[in-house]
Amino acid sequence: MSECGGRGGGSSSSEDAEDEGGGGGGPAGSDCLSSSPTLATASSAGRLRRGLRGAFLMARQRPELLCGAVALGCALLLALKFTCSRAKDVIIPAKPPVSFFSLRSPVLDLFQGQLDYAEYVRRDSEVVLLFFYAPWCGQSIAARAEIEQAASRLSDQVLFVAINCWWNQGKCRKQKHFFYFPVIYLYHRSFGPIEYKGPMSAVYIEKFVRRVMKPLLYIPSQSELLDFLSNYEPGVLGYFEFSGSPQPPGYLTFFTSALHSLKKALESTSSPRALVSFTGEWHLETKIYVLDYLGTVRFGVITNKHLAKLVSLVHSGSVYLHRHFNTSLVFPREVLNYTAENICKWALENQETLFRWLRPHGGKSLLLNNELKKGPALFLFIPFNPLAESHPLIDEITEVALEYNNCHGDQVVERLLQHLRRVDAPVLESLALEVPAQLPDPPTITASPCCNTVVLPQWHSFSRTHNVCELCVNQTSGGMKPSSVSVPQCSFFEMAAALDSFYLKEQTFYHVASDSIECSNFLTSYSPFSYYTACCRTISRGVSGFIDSEQGVFEAPTVAFSSLEKKCEVDAPSSVPHIEENRYLFPEVDMTSTNFTGLSCRTNKTLNIYLLDSNLFWLYAERLGAPSSTQVKEFAAIVDVKEESHYILDPKQALMKLTLESFIQNFSVLYSPLKRHLIGSGSAQFPSQHLITEVTTDTFWEVVLQKQDVLLLYYAPWCGFCPSLNHIFIQLARNLPMDTFTVARIDVSQNDLPWEFMVDRLPTVLFFPCNRKDLSVKYPEDVPITLPNLLRFILHHSDPASSPQNVANSPTKECLQSEAVLQRGHISHLEREIQKLRAEISSLQRAQVQVESQLSSARRDEHRLRQQQRALEEQHSLLHAHSEQLQALYEQKTRELQELARKLQELADASENLLTENTWLKILVATMERKLEGRDGAESLAAQREVHPKQPEPSATPQLPGSSPPPANVSATLVSERNKENRTD
């Protein structure tokens, strides 16, 4: 049965047996597996067949599994095929470009990027503007109308070509690799490209194109010469005589250098270079500022020799660089080669600028940051039209800059100032340095009946010299029509400001006691129409007694408090200086205004002046404090990054020379009367339903100084911990009565506050108790900000007796005592401050003496260096002359050596000819000798023949009849001589 069953199994049983044997069921199987690898292969194949057979049997028993497996496999194949087909990128070809400009536009539009055609048409035009654009670029689309407007005005002189440099099949895209669009290139014949990087405005583009078309200005007269030299841009003048030639030597080079100046200025980086020149005993740092074409070097041409002598130009082809404060220069042709690149480089490296034009591009930039780090900056926003023939406001700013930097009263600068003021001046003989001319008298100041008597108490340090002063606030028209200026009666606050400034000017009145009247004139603010005068005199005891009896002049003063707080009535006398109303003790005296000329050298807060076009960058002016809606976009601001403050000129005042001078003067003084400008967000409303009051810069005093306890939270949007306190302050506001307590907050990132109210960390909580605002308290930093802690803090520092109901009925005795204590403390504090200031003044005086000694030593060193320089120059001239002599001697010796070499060559040729002739002579001599020997031999033979006639003669060479036979060795000798001759050759 076992055998049948085995056979009955057929192949299946045999395969099972093989599998079992091969699988190592017994010792024999394992030996076979270890000995032969083919058995292992057969075993794995058997297992595969067995698995397939099991799957087939299962599918036959359960056909639904087979169908599911087949469906699953098909789904996997379809998914794999779909995934592989989507792996490749699907690229849609770009649409063909269309015309960017209209067909009626004067601009030639190469919208397919035909750069080769643009180069072809450029060769036939004198001036060409290439406008590279991208059709999708918003800046290119915005500049399209500006380009068309400029082309409509210049199409008869300039070829405008627009090129699509974005289409991937165009040559422009393949050859040009721009990082931004649009890009403007200008070509002047074969010179270029000159890239334009100015504002994309039609007037600016047209002005730039016209400057490329005409890079040189013709100077025909003295008036235009003064216009050229008084311009704020540096000027380079070239003198050329056209009488002898239509194109004098060097003119084309000078013309090309003017084009190079435009190109180099546009290619230069924003980092300025500093050059220091020394003239006399002072120096001025000259900084190169180049941006676009504004502020670049202007080039002019003079053809009149008499006009050229005014600027020290004598020879045709000379080049002159004008500088206002340093010595003007003439191009050193003996040092530098007269090329366009050298002239341009020399002018850019040695130029001197009064102020700089700024053009922020609107993106991230360090332009303003780099300029503000140099020191205080005066920003002037003015509406600028580049195409205008004249710019009166810029002329006034130029006049201010010239006076501000004219530290030594240079006569050339004074003449230029007279020309800017349109003052008739004598005809110029030369622009050489002369004695400084007298400055024009300042405008007179008309005093108005607004004077007050100032009583200096005995505790003041200089009361021993002047203890009675008369303060007068004066009004002046400042050059305007008297009818247009009103003279209002001054207020108490104006007099208080004058008093504050008066005490800051204490050193002005520190003199020996005298009965004479000593007066001084000061500016109270940056308004050119407001001055105050202080006239002081020492009053004796008799005079003092007389004054005491006169209408109570020196009555006990009153102490003024803030109008927003409750005042305590003080009846006791005080030692605080006070102001009397309309008390005239002294007659009117003449007053003189402060001198503005050379102020930059007399202050430690020298200003750098910058100009911005308000038509383009008024947003920056608004951020500095200018009104957003105004008819005339003129604005001035001083920014001092070191002091973290900035000041603005009153927008109600006109931007002109007098206002700018007063503005700069008030900033330059040691104790500036200018008030720091605070920038805040929009005015916040105080609706009744809001529990927390939002405070701004404008509403800070109104909220904090109100007759309530105020808890103020300082926060900022970028402070991550600040929002977590909102619910705490909302609960606090709900728990406290709103009629006696105010919870407020202020965003310090958008609102500036006075320095005494600024904080150094966020969040910060300040508490201002009612009626004691000067005793504000800061919440402890080491205590968590929670509702219970805030309530304890408020209850601890608030005064229950200071409620509004008790304030009106509170006794005045305690208030008077506290105020007396405060006043005594204030007086002692002021005395200490005065002593500190005097010590500082003495130290400054000592430092001044040291600086003067250092300056004197520096002057001596400079004088010594100049002498050494002159000695070196003399040595250099001697060496130069000696070098020229050596050069001439070298050339002479060279010529002699060349002549000697020629003669040696002739001798060599003659020697060669002599050698040849000598050879032939040797041959001839040898031949003659052989002939002689032959004759001797013939004679001997004849004698022998006579002796032996019967002997036969030997055979010889045939001879001519009548000739003697040649010797036997003649031919051999000739051959040897010829061989020698050949070897000699």
Curated annotation (Swiss-Prot):
* Skewed-composition ranges (Low complexity): 29-38
Pfam (any one): Thioredoxin
What InterPro entries does the annotation carry? Thioredoxin-like_sf, Thioredoxin_dom-contain_11, Thioredoxin_domain
Q: Per the annotation, which location comes first and is thus the protein's main one?
A: endoplasmic reticulum
> Mind listing the UniProt keywords for this protein, alphabetically?
Coiled coil, Disulfide bond, Endoplasmic reticulum, Membrane, Phosphoprotein, Redox-active center, Repeat, Transmembrane, Transmembrane helix
Q: Which residues carry this modification: Phosphoserine?
A: 828
- State the residue spans of region: Disordered: 1-38, 935-985
Where is the sequence biased in composition, kind Gly residues? 1-11
Record's keyword annotation contains Endoplasmic reticulum: yes
Record-annotated Thioredoxin domain positions: 92-214, 649-799
Q: Which GO terms describe its cellular component?
A: endoplasmic reticulum membrane
Classification via SUPFAM superfamilies: Thioredoxin-like
Tissue expression from the record = Widely expressed at low level. Expressed at higher level in thyroid and prostate.
Q: How does it assemble?
A: Interacts with the cytoplasmic part of DUOX1 and DUOX2. Interacts with TPO and CYBA.
* Protein function: May act as a redox regulator involved in DUOX proteins folding. The interaction with DUOX1 and DUOX2 suggest that it belongs to a multiprotein complex constituting the thyroid H(2)O(2) generating system. It is however not sufficient to assist DUOX1 and DUOX2 in H(2)O(2) generation.
Q: Which family does it belong to?
A: Belongs to the protein disulfide isomerase family.
The entry's protein name is: Thioredoxin domain-containing protein 11
Organism equals: Homo sapiens (Human)
What is the taxonomic lineage of the source species? Eukaryota, Metazoa, Chordata, Craniata, Vertebrata
